[in-house]
Amino acid sequence: MFRGTTIVAVRRGDRVSVAGDGQVTFGDSTILKHGAKKIRRLYNGEVIVGFAGSVADAMTLSQKFEEKLEQYGGNLKRAAVELAQEWRKDKILRKLEALLIAADKKDTLLISGTGEVIEPDEDVIGIGSGGNYAMAAALALRYNTDLDTEEIARKALEIASKICVYTNNNITVETL
């Protein structure tokens, strides 16, 4: 099974950045790819998603989410709830193993296959194998520096890559 992803989203004021590392790991010991892109812009560039979990599953869910965004006119929360409901109820989708972070100019959401759509209390959220490390680093940087969201997200992933063996420092960042 493919694994090993770290995604972090950081919001400050009217800016949000979502960053992901580039490592794809097969099993527990083989790195297959160093430069995978796990961050995508959807809905005419107005929404950023980052995904963690099985690569094929994450891509499938990202495509489904894009369909929901189109169906609901770019309404992030509505599209997320509809995706989560379909994900939980559909016999095939229910078996997919992935998490999504989705962000637009107003909201940041975590979407899971168990039907949860969570808006974090803090303006930072992390997922994947190094997600907790990246989230902790991003929170510290957000509250103790004047760095912008892109710099915070990038530095948080750099820190996570020094701790988590499934995370590398080939980082992609998208900002709204």
UniProtKB/Swiss-Prot annotation:
Taxonomic lineage is: Bacteria, Bacillati, Bacillota, Clostridia, Thermoanaerobacterales
Q: Which InterPro entries match?
A: ATP-dep_Prtase_HsIV_su (IPR022281), Ntn_hydrolases_N (IPR029055), Proteasome_sua/b (IPR001353), Proteasome_suB-type (IPR023333)
**Which organism is the protein's source?**
Caldanaerobacter subterraneus subsp. tengcongensis (strain DSM 15242 / JCM 11007 / NBRC 100824 / MB4)
Q: Catalytic residues? A: 5
Name the chain's protein. Answer: ATP-dependent protease subunit HslV
SUPFAM superfamilies reported in the protein's UniProt record: N-terminal nucleophile aminohydrolases (Ntn hydrolases) (SSF56235)
Mechanisms controlling activity: Allosterically activated by HslU binding.
Question: Which Pfam families does the record cross-reference, listed alphabetically?
Answer: Proteasome
Annotated GO biological processes are:
proteolysis involved in protein catabolic process
